[in-house]
UniProtKB/Swiss-Prot annotation:
GO terms for cellular component: axon terminus; dendrite membrane; neuronal cell body membrane; plasma membrane; postsynaptic membrane; presynaptic membrane; voltage-gated potassium channel complex. It comes from Homo sapiens (Human). It is a multi-pass membrane protein. A motif (Selectivity filter) lies at residues 436-441. The gene is KCNC4. This is Voltage-gated potassium channel KCNC4.
Length: 635
């Protein structure tokens, strides 16, 4: 092994590969004796490597451990701390309560210089581990970058769907999940003074608004909301059915209308025919419009954000579909020509009622998935349109000139024997042919035109078939994510212990009351001046936020009471946070965990493993005396 290392140092020189000399062997043996091995225990798995290997990536957490001059090696009474059972000056062992499988890839990155992403580890977990070890996510190899990015795409897709967390019973929002949403709605609707004494105040008056909003907006919030949703669905179907039946001859009545017009002393009689709809359909449509009007008014009065409500496309469709009915009722008694023109225009606008079918997206997940798929596949649709436009332009021009080849000499324009009189008409034929519809209204009649038609059909099949699989894959991905989120069980609130406050008597102390086991005395002023922050990793599996770091700037806010549970918006924002944002905070933070640590005398004590961010001008000994289980890292 030593000779191979020595030989590798000679490779690449002009003189070629030389055999190692005795001097080289002695130097390499001296280096091997001088280099110290380091043992890193991660989650119970011991990894052994050289300090020189860890120094390949300076500025990372493992590089700090390998630096003996920067306080990376814990010391007790000036001696090195080895693992229990090893000599005091031998290999030094450090313990980290992290994922051992991911650390193997991290350590291999130090050895080979290539960072690969494990396929059996969830993306957010690998992202958190990279943040903890101080490795930038951009160092991931290109072959693993797609695997690494999949979790972010999945998280963004999950955030798009606002599917409820309700169970199959159909009951209202229960326990903490419903309370969080109601509290969030109250906060959006205005200042809520939740007290018994304020029941008649503004808080009491606004307390019904989120309930009414959930009743008409969220079909899964309660049983009453489901009843309202089914009623709305019933009226939508009835309105669309009525709209379609109005065009059938069986429900149309022809009337002869006589008009007497007087212009000065001249009186004229005009007869005209009008088509009226059966009164029963008009009454049914009136009942449906009354329901939609009530629903629209309740939702706009109780909405948390009026601006967002007005900008919603479905709400605009509701308003445009309701307005023509009232205008028709108001103008029906007028017989002037202007009133008849307005009524004719309103009858044309009534087709907007058919767009109410899109309100079914609140009740059917598949329709929501289709809408999100269309929005997510915008680039593919643009690519499809560009391909189709290029093909239409090319083949319409080719078919026009190909049909001119068989023209007779007596026909200078060449239009007598073909339907392709000009290139714009060829656009229609090219679109129909490329989309494989083939209506048969236009077709080539010459052998050259038939050849162009065959090429156009083949090009259409190949062109349209390319973007379609991408759109289908997007639909499958969104649908599977939506189904998974619907079946996701409710998350109960978990108790998260608050971090130790700066003025707490237990701050910066170990679990035992012995002075020699404490990592720092509570009377050490330099530590407080530097704003050292501690954080217990009490629940490392709660929503993936247990490893969120706290910066020194947030140290002043630790003395204030913390919320017991983040709001749904805060949880969504934390889940969407990127690694780079967290790396900025992690650069000025440290991790605190408790465990057993081996001392120089061979005994095992309870201690605290602390990583602190200290400036270079202050030595670690000035901030806190080195004790067993304490590790100081330079800035």
């Amino acid at each position: 092994m030593i000779s191979s290392v020595c030989v590798s140092s000679y490779r690449g020189r002009k003189s070629g590969n030389k055999p190692p000399s005795k001097t080289c062997l002695k130097e390499e043996m001296a280096k091997g004796e001088a280099s110290e091995k380091i043992i890193i225990n991660v989650g119970g798995t011991r990894h052994e490597t050289y300090r020189s290997t860890l120094r390949t990536l300076p500025g990372t957490r493992l590089a700090w451990l390998a630096d003996p001059d920067g306080g990376g090696r814990p010391e007790t009474d000036g001696g090195g701390v080895g693992s229990s059972g090893s000599s005091g000056g031998g290999g030094c062992e450090f313990f980290f309560d992290r994922h051992p499988g991911v650390f193997a890839y991290v350590l291999n990155y130090y050895r080979t210089g290539k960072l690969h992403c494990p396929a059996d580890v969830c993306g957010p977990l690998f992202e958190e581990e990279l943040t903890f070890w101080g490795i930038d996510e951009t160092d991931v190899e290109p072959c693993c970058w797609m695997t690494y990015r999949q979790h972010r795409d999945a998280e963004e897709a999950l955030d798009i769907f606002e599917s409820p967390d309700g169970g199959g019973s159909g009951a209202g929002p229960s326990d903490e999940a419903g309370d969080d949403e109601r509290e969030l709605a109250l906060q959006r609707l205005g200042p809520h003074e939740g007290g018994a004494g304020h029941g008649a105040g503004s808080g009491g008056c606004r307390g019904w608004q989120p309930r009414m909003w959930a009743l008409f907006e969220d079909p899964y919030s309660s049983r009453a909301a489901r009843v309202v949703a089914f009623a709305s669905l019933f009226f939508i179907l009835v309105s669309i059915t009525t709209f379609c039946l109005e065009t059938h001859e069986a429900f149309n009545i022809d009337r002869n209308v006589t008009e007497i017009l007087r212009v000065g002393n001249i009186t004229s009689v005009h007869f005209r025919r009008e088509v009226e709809t059966e009164p029963i359909l008009t009454y049914i449509e009136g009942v449906c419009v009354l329901w939609f009007t009530l629903e629209f008014l309740v939702r706009i009065v109780c909405c948390p954000d009026t601006l967002d409500f007005v900008k919603n496309l479905l709400n605009i469709i509701d308003f445009v579909a309701i307005l023509p009915f009232y205008l028709e009722v108001g103008l029906s008694g007028l017989s002037s020509k202007a009133a008849r023109d307005v009524l004719g225009f309103l009858r044309v606008v009534r087709f907007v009622r058919i767009l109410r079918i899109f309100k079914l997206t609140r009740h059917f997940v598949g329709l929501r998935v289709l809408g999100h798929t269309l929005r997510a596949s915008t680039n593919e649709f643009l690519l499809l349109i560009i391909f189709l436009a290029l093909g239409v332009l090319i083949f319409a021009t080719m078919i026009y000139y190909a049909e001119r080849i068989g023209a007779r000499p007596s026909d200078p324009r060449g239009n007598d024997h073909t339907d392709f009189k000009n290139i714009p008409i060829g656009f229609w034929w090219a679109v129909v042919t490329m989309t494989t519809l083939g209506y048969g209204d236009m077709y080539p009649k010459t052998w050259s035109g038939m050849l162009v038609g065959a090429l156009c059909a083949l090009a259409g099949v190949l062109t349209i078939a390319m973007p379609v699989p991408v759109i289908v894959n997007n639909f499958g991905m969104y649908y599977s994510l939506a189904m998974a989120k619907q079946k996701l069980p409710k998350k109960r609130k978990k108790h998260v212990p608050r971090p130790a406050q700066l003025e707490s008597p237990m701050y910066c102390k170990s679990e035992e009351t012995s002075p020699r086991d404490s990592t720092c005395s509570d009377t050490s002023p330099p530590a407080r001046e530097e704003g050292m922050i501690e954080r217990k990793r009490a629940d490392s599996k709660q929503n993936g936020d247990a490893n969120a770091v706290l910066s020194d700037e947030e140290g002043a806010g630790l003395t204030q009471p913390l919320a017991s549970s983040p709001t749904p918006e805060e949880r969504r924002a934390l889940r969407r946070s990127t690694t780079r944002d967290r790396n900025k905070k992690a650069a000025a933070c440290f991790l605190l965990s408790t465990g057993d640590y081996a001392c120089a005398d061979g005994s095992v004590r309870k201690g605290t493993f602390v990583l602190r961010d200290l400036p270079l001008q202050h030595s670690p000994e000035a901030a806190c005396p080195p004790t067993a289980g304490t590790l100081f890292l330079p800035h």
